[in-house]
Amino acid sequence: MAFALPSSLVSICDKSFIKPSSLTPSTLRFHKLSFIDQSLSNMYIPCAFFYPKVQQRLEDSKNSDELSHIAHLLQTSLSQTLVSYYPYAGKLKDNATVDCNDMGAEFLSVRIKCSMSEILDHPHASLAESIVLPKDLPWANNCEGGNLLVVQVSKFDCGGIAISVCFSHKIGDGCSLLNFLNDWSSVTRDHTTTTLVPSPRFVGDSVFSTKKYGSLITPQILSDLNECVQKRLIFPTDKLDALRAKVAEESGVKNPTRAEVVSALLFKCATKASSSMLPSKLVHFLNIRTMIKPRLPRNAIGNLSSIFSIEATNMQDMELPTLVRNLRKEVEVAYKKDQVEQNELILEVVESMREGKLPFENMDGYENVYTCSNLCKYPYYTVDFGWGRPERVCLGNGPSKNAFFLKDYKAGQGVEARVMLHKQQMSEFERNEELLEFIA
């Protein structure tokens, strides 16, 4: 289709605020943010789920009633879920505290005047997909007092729906988001019963207290959305297996993971597309729930992360076997560290504060710093509200640059990568022949 501006395709049918179905106890009124929480800007983690077969379509004359019914079902289950996820129904009091005042989460009901396939099959899908996210909201700096959770349900002319969630990064990471989505979708599926009660564990500042380093002022996102673009790349199972076999043979690394080979390839190609190739650094984020002693459960809610990194100072460093070998070495080192006392993410934040710059900004003097968030094995494609698995899960386009997000592809053992780069760099990156060899 000739893609129209979102304003010409989208009509908002309803906007409301969903409060927890029961009041939050006064003993839980204030949620303390950890040092890592405070180091993050007031941005959202935006994601959307596309469900092409929701239910048998009603007659066109009743189409608006169908949207109302779906919205009511989701609102009711969200209200029940927020009882357990009470900080997301509150407001930021300051950069150290969430006031869990039960003000509620914002909920939008939207009609989109096209079919879902026109969005999913669009040649610029990463841009087109953003139509199901609240306008101007994803990755935005939601100032103190803003909503910490915003949900939008969008109904297409074909009868399919998309459910998008903008989830405050101040309170939780990608694993926290998945916990919330699994709990909310489970409550929605089982809406005829009242036995299911989600049981997230909010960690707050119990692991990474601010007592050692002091409180932080909220950092701001400085990148310009108009200068940053996102591309969706699919690494099919067969091509990914070939890449892993090639790297294993040339590097000596036993069973290189999907994330290792894909992130190394993206780093190599992005660096090559940059106007200033070297020196460069690749920073991987780590979920440390199972690395902390005692281990934290998977339902722990918070920003429970660390980092490890590799560097490239010459052309030999940029060869795939070398990159993967170095990634394997550094992740093994990370697993041997005390991720509370020797947390590299905290050390980077503290060092950045000392130098008066943002984290990862010219890190250790490296002009090109790329970050990678690996969500492979996080089962986003199993989030089922009662209409089966989603056809696609997408991440909102944002003002980040030099960022890679990896997650499972919907079928097999493939990987879907979302790559965010500067416009000019992206135009060179997407023509890289080595990259094109391994993507669909």
From Swiss-Prot:
Q: Name one GO molecular function term.
A: aminoacyltransferase activity
Supply the enzyme class, top level: transferase
Q: Which residues form the signal peptide?
A: none
Q: Give the GO biological process terms.
A: alkaloid biosynthetic process
- What EC number(s) has UniProt assigned to this enzyme? 2.3.2.35
User: Superkingdom of the source?
Assistant: Eukaryota
- Entry keyword Secreted: no
All disulfide bonds of the chain are none
Q: Which InterPro entries match?
A: CAT-like_dom_sf (IPR023213)
One protein family per Pfam: Transferase
Catalytic residues (UniProt): 169 (proton acceptor), 384 (proton acceptor)
Catalytic reaction list: vanillylamine + (6E)-8-methylnon-6-enoyl-CoA = capsaicin + CoA + H(+); (6E)-8-methylnon-6-enoyl-CoA + 4-hydroxy-3-methoxy-benzenemethanol = capsiate + CoA
Statement: the UniProt record of this protein carries the keyword Ribosomal protein: no
Give the UniProt keywords, A-Z.
Acyltransferase, Transferase
Q: Which family does it belong to?
A: Belongs to the plant acyltransferase family.
This chain's function reads: Involved in the biosynthesis of capsaicinoids and capsinoids natural products, pungent alkaloids synthesized from phenylpropanoid intermediates in the placental tissue of chili pepper fruit acting as repellant on herbivorous mammals and conferring spiciness to hot peppers. Catalyzes the biosynthesis of capsaicin, a pungent component, and of capsiate, a non-pungent component, from vanillylamine and vanillyl alcohol, respectively. Can transfer an acyl from 8-methylnon-6-enoyl-CoA to vanillylamine forming capsaicin and CoA.
What is the protein named?
Answer: Acyltransferase Pun1
Q: Which organism is it from?
A: Capsicum frutescens (Cayenne pepper)
UniProt lists the gene as: PUN1
